[in-house]
Amino acid sequence: VKLYGYFRSSAAYRVRIALNLKKLPYDHEAVHLTRDGGWQWREEYRAINPQKRVPSLALSTGEVLLQSLAIIEYLDEVFPEPPLFPADAIERAQVRAVAQIVACDIHPINNLAVLNYLKGPLKHDQAAADDWYRHWVVQGFDAVEALVRPGPYAFGTHVTVADLCLVPQVFNARRLKVDMAKYPKIAAADAACLKLPAFDKARPENQPDAE
């Protein structure tokens, strides 16, 4: 398979972790989101992903999968070991809730396209854009901190999709100077995950396109 991604993209980071946990080899194709106006706008990439976002996962069949959570669910269904969702239905719903707080509430209003719109047409400066980012991360993390049950991962002794979403978000939260001291449970789960080779290999600084 081939993963189209960007080293600092939270969404691509989630999929890298999933591929590593499943021990699935993949080719990395960089889609630099800021260089030369953004490679995602090029015609050749628009033909792969009409949404012009990352990640995209190209399968050996020729099919291309979009959206990180959809890709992760596909990988978990086709390659079930190790499972990324609990067997119990209630626990699955709880894990999905945290994953979706990150992927559906925090991330969409803080992605590069939104931040560029704030700084471009809406004429906010970088400091204002950073404040915007931190505001929504804090609001989301306040909820997540109340929901996770580290032991040592977000929901116990097994890594789940909640961890796959939290670790990339914590990386970018720290980059934008969110005070993680307020979130000891999130920080503990993040630290436990990053001790695992699959997570370490997926870190942004370990990617071929890292800057």
Mark where each language-model region is.
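GST-like domain detector, emphasizing the conserved glutathione-binding G-site
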Residues: V1-A128
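Positions that flank functional sites
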Residues: L33-R35, A188, P208-D209
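Short beta-strand(s) of the beta-wing in winged-helix/HTH DNA-binding folds
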Residues: P55-A58, A154, D200
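Active-site-flanking alpha-helical
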Residues: D76, Q169-V170, R203
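GST-like fold's C-terminal all-alpha helical module
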Residues: V102-K195
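Carbohydrate-binding/catalytic loop surfaces
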Residues: K119, Q207-E211
